């Protein structure tokens, strides 16, 4: 339970803190930037590591009179901050759920100060606002706020975490708002909504220079050094204000990261520098305060635009406005910030060299713009800046009065037109960073002018193109009026176009602003602008020269067609003879390779292989000399005859020109379109020259059977052949070998004889082999038995006819041998038994 006891005072302190936060929501934002300018001078050398550390530093800075006491308090607070990591172990030691819940609640409060720490500061700002209502004097409000902060810090001593988070937020806020409350009383009325986001950014800016954004802690010391070199405190204060306004929300986010990363740095070292810088800041604030009342009225009326000149809707711009207003330091610095806020609405960040680019544009036009009280983007020109320095506060007051009138006229007009115009100016201004101190002071004065007339920039948008289009500065004033009248028919230059026209031209001004930006780089060319009219003159001259040249060329038309004809001929040669053209090109490209080809050619021509293509000697029938590729002839070896032949072929292929006769007459179509038909002298005829037929040889068995019958018919044949006489006797002697007739077959013989008589061809077959002497005896004996049956009745006749002689001439023997080969063996043997007769052989010879 001992842990729960200290938790009760923490809860009380947290409740008191929440009440303070509720009381101060919107005014807290301006209060912190007031205290921050003091830190900015001090904390430029150091960066706050965390939100808690930043709050502790602010609490230490409260008693500026006694820096040693503050250092002692800071040492105690630092120890408390170091004890913050002990927060997680507490719930570990306290096993009870209640203690853990209370600890988690306190942890939530501890983590909240990073986000809620911003609203806590506004609570102190409310106190500072009350002190502002009492007095705008030097630092009195800050002292009263410091006392209140000390009381709150004493209440938070019970717990380390609550002390660390609550104390730094309370004491730091009152000291700064005292200087800035004067400004914010005027500015906060217009921008009460964005307080929570704004205080967080100023905390980080405190580490940097008087800027709202802490991430520029490294960049801010450079900005501070610039005003110091210029040796004017007022200029330095104004410069500090502008860089504070310039840093964008991105810079603020970066500063948050840098604060966390820089937690390791010692706080004691930073506190000493902070105490000294705060004293310097107070002195500068006291000196700059008399200039505040002039700027307060302007800041309230003019909406601030985000940095970098981005265009936002009106409600967004009003919400983002307090971010820029929270940055003003004190006294004149706050006034300059308000001026910067009004100008940044369209201009974005105002860099030191932005005005240099426009100095060449409007040395002559600024006088008319001032008389017209126009808050155009051209008010930032060097001439307007110099005039502002000379005029002083009286000119500013006059401009403010004119601004109020113009605001009354243009209040109805949408204000994002101003953002469009001024955004172009910011882009123009971004380039130059030199002479930052002088430019800051001059630009701030110009911003005051613009604050007086925030919405009058719309009619001036068309004015930019006339300046660019104008050939000389002397004629720019006339050209501006003429261009305004041409671009937009109404010419209320003095009245600056009523709101109705502006509502109609809301879309239009964006278009002229873009060409204005593009034409800005041509400022250096303004001196050369008289040359621009000469250029169109030159173009006209060139066109006239071209016309003269065309006329000159048109005079001698006859030579032109000749040139064209020659070109056409060459072109047609390429079309009709691409091979020749390519060969000519190859000649030029391969001129260096000619000797090699000649060497190779000699080696192949002199060898036997060249006859067969140069590879190998083929077998007979493999090589066809007609198919062998022709050897490439080297260009150096070409004879003059070859060149002449090529030239002749080129001329032959060249199109022949038509003979020019009377142009009006044309040949009849029958003649012009005559078609030549060529017919060959040879007629083609087709027919069958020969044919082949294949047939099988048919052998009849009847012939074999008839052999036995042929033997039977020979008696009659013999009777018919009795006239032969003695020639057949020899054959009969040989046939005496037949003996022993056993079976008489007379009927068969008679029947067969009749058949044999009807078949004389069969007799031829039988009579062929009558005189074969080569037949072996065994074969004869085997067939004799078969023939005895048929020859029984004929034996006596055979015996009587033995006187017949054998017909054995050499020719007959040769014929018989040929016929014997074609006849079967059994037929031969049957013939042996028969009686040969010369008549039968004669018949055979006579047959076809």
Swiss-Prot record:
The keyword Cytoplasm applies. Keywords: Cytoplasm, Cytoskeleton. Disulfide bonds: none annotated. It is found in: Cytoplasm, Cytoskeleton, Actin patch. Residues 377-393, 424-436, 810-822 have a biased composition (Acidic residues). Residues 657-668 have a biased composition (Basic residues). Its main location: cytoplasm. The keyword Cytoplasm applies. GO terms for cellular component: actin cortical patch. Residues 34-58, 291-307, 475-487 have a biased composition (Low complexity). Residues 11-28, 93-102, 190-228, 317-329, 541-552, 571-595 have a biased composition (Polar residues). Belongs to the AIM21 family. Involved in mitochondrial migration along actin filaments. This is Altered inheritance of mitochondria protein 21. It comes from Candida albicans (strain SC5314 / ATCC MYA-2876). The gene is AIM21.
């Amino acid at each position: 339970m001992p842990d729960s006891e200290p938790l009760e005072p923490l809860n009380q302190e947290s409740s008191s803190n929440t009440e303070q936060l509720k009381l101060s929501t919107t005014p807290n934002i301006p209060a912190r930037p007031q205290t921050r300018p003091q830190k900015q001078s001090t904390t430029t050398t150091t960066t706050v590591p965390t939100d808690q550390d930043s709050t502790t530093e602010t609490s230490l800075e409260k008693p500026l009179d006694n820096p040693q006491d503050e250092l002692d308090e800071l040492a105690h607070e630092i120890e408390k901050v170091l004890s913050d990591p002990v927060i997680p172990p507490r719930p570990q030691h306290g096993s009870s759920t209640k203690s853990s819940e209370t600890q988690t609640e306190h942890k939530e409060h501890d983590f909240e100060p990073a986000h809620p720490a911003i609203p806590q500061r506004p609570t102190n700002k409310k106190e500072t606002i009350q002190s502002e209502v009492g007095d705008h004097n030097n630092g009195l409000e800050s002292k009263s706020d410091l006392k209140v902060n000390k009381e709150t810090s004493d209440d938070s001593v019970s717990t380390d975490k609550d002390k660390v988070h609550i104390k730094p937020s309370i004491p730091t806020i009152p000291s700064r708002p005292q200087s800035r409350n004067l400004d914010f009383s005027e500015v906060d009325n217009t921008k009460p909504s964005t307080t929570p986001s704004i205080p967080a950014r100023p905390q980080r800016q405190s580490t940097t220079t008087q800027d709202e954004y802490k991430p520029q802690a490294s960049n801010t010391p450079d900005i501070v050094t610039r005003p110091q070199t210029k040796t004017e405190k007022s200029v330095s204060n104004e410069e500090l204000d502008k860089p504070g306004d310039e840093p964008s929300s991105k810079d603020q986010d970066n500063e948050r990261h840098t604060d966390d990363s820089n937690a390791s740095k010692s706080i004691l070292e930073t506190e000493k520098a902070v105490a000294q810088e705060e004293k310097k800041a107070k002195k500068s604030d006291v000196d700059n305060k008399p200039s505040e009342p002039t700027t307060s009225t302007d800041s309230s009326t003019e909406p601030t635009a985000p940095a970098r000149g981005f265009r936002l809707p009106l409600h967004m711009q009003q919400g983002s406005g307090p971010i820029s207003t929270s940055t003003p330091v004190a006294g004149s610095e706050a006034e300059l910030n308000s001026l910067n806020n009004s100008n940044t609405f369209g201009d974005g960040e105002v860099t030191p060299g932005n005005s240099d680019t426009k100095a060449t544009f409007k040395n002559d036009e600024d006088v008319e713009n001032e008389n017209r009280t126009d808050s155009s983007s051209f008010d930032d020109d060097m001439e307007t800046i110099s005039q502002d320095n000379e005029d002083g506060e009286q000119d500013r007051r006059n401009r403010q009065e004119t601004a109020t009138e113009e605001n009354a006229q243009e209040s109805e007009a949408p204000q994002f037109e101003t953002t469009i115009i001024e955004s172009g100016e910011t882009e123009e201004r971004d380039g130059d960073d030199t002479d930052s101190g002088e430019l800051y002071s001059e630009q701030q004065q110009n911003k005051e002018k613009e604050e007086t007339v925030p919405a009058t920039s719309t009619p001036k948008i068309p004015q930019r193109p006339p300046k660019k289009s104008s050939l000389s500065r002397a004629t720019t004033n006339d050209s501006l009026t003429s261009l305004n009248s041409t671009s937009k028919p109404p010419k209320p230059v003095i009245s600056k176009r009523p709101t109705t026209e502006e509502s109609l031209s809301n879309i239009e001004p964006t278009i002229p602003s873009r060409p204005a930006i593009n034409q800005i780089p041509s400022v250096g060319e303004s001196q050369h602008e008289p040359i621009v009219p000469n250029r169109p003159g030159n173009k006209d001259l060139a066109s006239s020269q071209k016309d003269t040249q065309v006329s000159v060329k048109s005079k001698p038309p006859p030579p032109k067609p000749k040139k064209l004809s020659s070109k056409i001929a060459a072109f047609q040669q390429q079309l009709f003879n691409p091979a020749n053209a390519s060969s000519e090109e190859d000649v030029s490209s391969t001129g260096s390779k000619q000797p090699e080809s000649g060497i190779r050619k000699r080696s192949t021509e002199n060898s036997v292989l060249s006859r067969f293509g140069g590879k190998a000697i083929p077998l007979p029938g493999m090589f066809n000399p007609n198919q062998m590729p022709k050897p490439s002839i080297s260009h150096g070896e070409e004879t003059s005859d070859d060149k002449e032949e090529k030239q002749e072929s080129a001329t032959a292929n060249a199109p022949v020109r038509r003979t020019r006769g009377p142009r009006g007459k044309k040949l009849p179509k029958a003649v012009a379109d005559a078609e030549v038909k060529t017919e060959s002298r040879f007629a083609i005829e087709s027919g069958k020259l020969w044919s082949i037929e294949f047939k099988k040889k048919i052998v009849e068995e009847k012939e074999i059977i008839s052999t036995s019958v042929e033997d039977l018919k020979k008696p009659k044949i013999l009777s018919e052949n009795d006239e032969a006489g003695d020639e057949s006797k020899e054959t009969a002697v040989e046939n005496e070998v037949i003996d022993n007739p056993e079976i008489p077959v007379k009927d068969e013989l008679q029947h067969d004889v009749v058949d044999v008589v009807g078949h004389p061809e069969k007799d031829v077959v039988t009579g062929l082999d009558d005189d074969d002497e080569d037949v072996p005896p065994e074969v004869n004996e085997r067939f004799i038995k078969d023939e005895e049956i048929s020859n029984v009745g004929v034996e006596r006749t055979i015996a009587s006819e033995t006187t017949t002689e054998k017909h054995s001439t050499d020719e007959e023997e040769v014929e018989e041998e040929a016929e014997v080969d074609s006849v079967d063996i059994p037929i031969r043997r049957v013939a042996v038994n028969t009686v040969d007769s010369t008549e039968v052989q004669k018949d055979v010879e006579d047959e076809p």
